[in-house]
């Protein structure tokens, strides 16, 4: 594209070209196998420590069978939005089971997790309203807030004093919504929900929690952040995704029945998007059943997390304040982060680089994520290789 200012903007985007020239490009890496603890890349075995499949259910034969059965019964797609011809009986069944799971009156499905934040934020709030966001909230929360045309205010990461100060300066009679990640996707720490909800009640603000990385990980039977703290009644909206612990694709929002009914008829990402495919719905239903009936998956996830965290700390890795299976290993240099990611893949370990602008350059890191299905031998092998690569890269954060 070479037309005018748009062409100029495109031509100035050089980072991909520069990384490829250095052999450090680490995105869109094609995987030739199932998303499991070991994957195949370029025909080679690679240990997978970059997946969000926390419970390792993407390869569960019962879930695969449920998806196959749904394909036979309903076909490959719904050919319309939920608002019109795209609602199946299994959509309704899943909504009912999800709302009961997270302790809310009702739920509405979205075709992706990203849309699950876009929809509520963009239609519930308006020009004279205020949305308060943690500065480390997911991009979908930020974009949904922008689409609402409301006044967006960011507070310091998990900084409740800053949140209180910013709420105190807002008009008392204004509509206010605090939206936060439950488990933060880059750092792995958990929101201080007890203090946040206390402040919200003090200032008459609603609360929405993004449980994308919390479902299947924390809370009673993996029911998420509000359940983890026993604060279901203090959280107005719970958002979750199916692409992580629930081994599928899509998302949902749960809350009071009247709010969900409002979303069904006003959230554009429901009304103008084709509905979740039958196979995705059926696989989510089966995964939800497994999570609720087989606690050993979550127990094993946490055993692996505790084991890996202890081993990494013993070797001197900087893990920040993580409290979850997301282990951020800080490198604090964009270029070294890319170099470490590439060298680890060459050595058979897949991790995800997190660099600016996703985080400040001085907080760049690799994200090392655990699955319930990892073995201790796999964890040991990956850490041994990381120690070697970090030393080769002269990463200063390695003690």
UniProtKB/Swiss-Prot annotation:
Keyword terms, alphabetized: Acyltransferase, Cell inner membrane, Cell membrane, Cytoplasm, Lipid metabolism, Membrane, Pyridoxal phosphate, Transferase
Membrane topology summary: Peripheral membrane protein
Modified residues annotated as N6-(pyridoxal phosphate)lysine in this record: 244
Cofactor(s) for this UniProt protein: pyridoxal 5'-phosphate
Enzyme class at the top of the EC tree: transferase
The enzyme's E.C. designation: 2.3.1.50
Coiled-coil stretches: none
Main location: cytoplasm
Family in the record: Belongs to the class-II pyridoxal-phosphate-dependent aminotransferase family.
Subunit comment: Homodimer.
Protein name per the record: Serine palmitoyltransferase
Organism: Sphingobacterium multivorum
Taxonomic lineage from the root: Bacteria, Pseudomonadati, Bacteroidota, Sphingobacteriia, Sphingobacteriales
């Amino acid at each position: 594209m070479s037309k005018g200012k748009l062409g100029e903007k495109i031509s100035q985007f050089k980072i991909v070209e520069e990384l490829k020239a250095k052999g450090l490009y680490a995105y869109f890496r094609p995987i030739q196998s199932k998303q499991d603890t070991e994957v195949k890349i370029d025909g080679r075995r690679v240990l997978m420590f970059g997946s969000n499949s926390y419970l390792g259910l993407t390869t569960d034969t019962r879930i695969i069978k449920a998806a196959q059965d749904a394909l036979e019964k309903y076909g490959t797609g719904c050919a319309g939005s939920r608002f019109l011809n795209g609602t199946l009986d299994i959509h309704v069944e899943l909504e009912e089971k999800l709302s009961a799971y997270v302790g809310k009156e009702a739920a509405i499905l979205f075709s992706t997790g990203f849309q699950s934040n876009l929809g509520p934020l963009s239609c519930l709030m308006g020009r004279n309203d205020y949305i308060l966001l943690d500065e480390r909230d997911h991009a979908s929360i930020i974009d949904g807030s922008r689409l609402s045309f409301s006044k967006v205010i960011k507070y310091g990461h998990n900084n409740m004093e800053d949140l209180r100060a910013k709420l105190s300066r807002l008009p008392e009679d204004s509509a206010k919504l605090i939206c936060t990640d439950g488990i933060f996707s880059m750092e792995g720490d958990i929101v201080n929900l007890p203090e946040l909800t206390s402040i919200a009640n003090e200032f008459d603000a609603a609360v929405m929690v993004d449980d994308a990385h919390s479902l299947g990980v924390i809370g009673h039977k993996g029911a998420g952040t509000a359940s983890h703290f026993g604060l279901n009644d203090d959280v107005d909206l719970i958002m979750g995704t199916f692409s992580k612990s629930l081994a599928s694709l899509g998302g949902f929002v749960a809350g009071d029945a009247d709010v969900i009914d409002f979303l069904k008829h006003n959230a554009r990402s429901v009304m103008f998007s084709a509905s979740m495919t039958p196979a995705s719905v059926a696989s989510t239903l089966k995964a939800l059943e497994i999570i609720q009936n087989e606690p050993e998956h979550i127990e094993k996830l946490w055993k692996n997390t505790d084991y890996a965290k202890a081993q990494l700390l013993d070797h001197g890795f900087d893990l920040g304040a993580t409290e979850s299976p997301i282990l951020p290993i800080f490198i604090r240099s964009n270029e070294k982060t890319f170099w470490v990611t590439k060298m680890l893949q060459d050595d058979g370990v897949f991790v995800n680089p997190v660099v600016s602008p996703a985080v400040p350059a001085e907080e760049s890191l690799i994200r090392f994520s655990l699955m319930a299905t990892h073995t201790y031998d796999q964890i040991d092998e990956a850490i041994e290789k990381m120690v070697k690569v970090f030393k080769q890269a002269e990463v200063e954060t390695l003690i």
